[in-house]
C-alpha cells in the first residue's frame, strides 16, 4: 500500500506498510504458531485477509489547529498535530465528509480542544459507515455542553451537504485525559443506530457499542464461526463478551437455545434488535459481566463461545470452564498471547482447529479463531 503520510515520515501507525501482504501474513502465522507451540493443533486453516486499503469503516480523529483551520487526525507524542484526512485506510466515501466538516467546525464555532492549555471544546470527531447502505454516524466529542446550541443551529447546513449522515450525536467528555468518549450521549437526529449487514444478518451499530473496524474480514470471521458451529452437535450455546451479537446471531438456528452476555447496555440493545428482526425467539441477550454470569451458573451448554477484550478471559472463567467442562469452546481473540495463556488454564481441552484473520493489515495485530474440544 502506498501512503504519502508514511513516506513523508508524518505517520508511523502502519509499521508493516513496507512489507507485501503475503509477507505480513507469514509473519503473523509464524507468531501464532510460536505462541501455540506447546499445544498440538489438529488443523491449521489458511489465513483469511481482505483489502489492503480503504477497508476501515471507522475514523477516530483528534481535532486540533484553530477554529478557522481545524486539523483532523492525531497528535504526535510531542503534541504536534497531524492531519490524517488522506489516510489510505479510509474508504473514498470519507473524503467528502472530512472536507465538509472543516468549514462546519468554523461555522458552528467549535473551538478545537488544546491539550497543553486545557482550553477549547471540540476534542474528537468519530465517523462510522455502514457498508450495506452507505449510511453514516457522526459523533462530536465535546468537553462540555457550552457549544451545543451553536452546533444545533449550524447543523442543517451540514445535513444538506451530507445527506448520508443518518445518525449525529454529541458526546460529552469533560475529563482532561486521552479518553475517546464520556458517558453522556446527546442525539441530534431521530435515527439512533446504523444497520450493517454481514452474510444476510442485520447488525446494529449504536454510538457507544463496539463494532469491528474491518467489515470485509469481520464478515468472514462470523461466517467461519457459523460454519464451525453447524458441524457440531449443539442445541444450546453461550456467547460470552458478545458485543452487538455478531457471533451468536450468525451461529443461532431457529431451534437452538442461545444466551448472549455483554456488559455494555448499548451493544445488548443492538443484539436484541437484530434477534427480533431475524425472528429468533430462543435467543436471550443480557447486559451482565460475562465472567460473573457464567460462574454463577450450575450447568453449562454444549458450546461456550468467548470473544474477550485484549486481556483474555482470565483465570476465574478458565477455572470454571475446566470444572464444568462444556464439550466445545470456540475462542475468538484479538490478542493471541492472552489466548495462549488462557488455553494453558484449560488442560482438559485439545485444539481441533485454528484460523488467523488479518483484521489489521500493516500492523502486527491479528484476530484468531480457535476450536477447543474436551478430551
Swiss-Prot record:
Keyword Metal-binding: yes
GO annotation (BP), single: rRNA base methylation
Domain of life: Bacteria
Keyword Ribonucleoprotein in annotation: no
Positions that bind [4Fe-4S] cluster: 3, 11, 14, 87
Binding-site list for S-adenosyl-L-methionine: 212, 241, 262, 307
A Pfam family matched in the record: tRNA_U5-meth_tr
Top-level EC class: transferase
Active-site residues, Swiss-Prot/TrEMBL: 334 (nucleophile)
SUPFAM superfamilies per the UniProt record, alphabetical: S-adenosyl-L-methionine-dependent methyltransferases (SSF53335)
InterPro entries membership: 23SrRNA_MeTrfase_RlmC, MeTrfase_TrmA_AS, MeTrfase_TrmA_CS, SAM-dependent_MTases_sf, U5_MeTrfase_fam
Catalytic activity field: uridine(747) in 23S rRNA + S-adenosyl-L-methionine = 5-methyluridine(747) in 23S rRNA + S-adenosyl-L-homocysteine + H(+)
EC number(s) given by UniProt: 2.1.1.189
PROSITE patterns cross-referenced by the UniProt entry: SAM_MT_RNA_M5U, TRMA_1, TRMA_2
UniProt keywords, alphabetically: 4Fe-4S, Iron, Iron-sulfur, Metal-binding, Methyltransferase, rRNA processing, S-adenosyl-L-methionine, Transferase
Primary role: Catalyzes the formation of 5-methyl-uridine at position 747 (m5U747) in 23S rRNA.
Family note: Belongs to the class I-like SAM-binding methyltransferase superfamily. RNA M5U methyltransferase family. RlmC subfamily.
Protein name: 23S rRNA (uracil(747)-C(5))-methyltransferase RlmC
Organism: Escherichia coli O157:H7
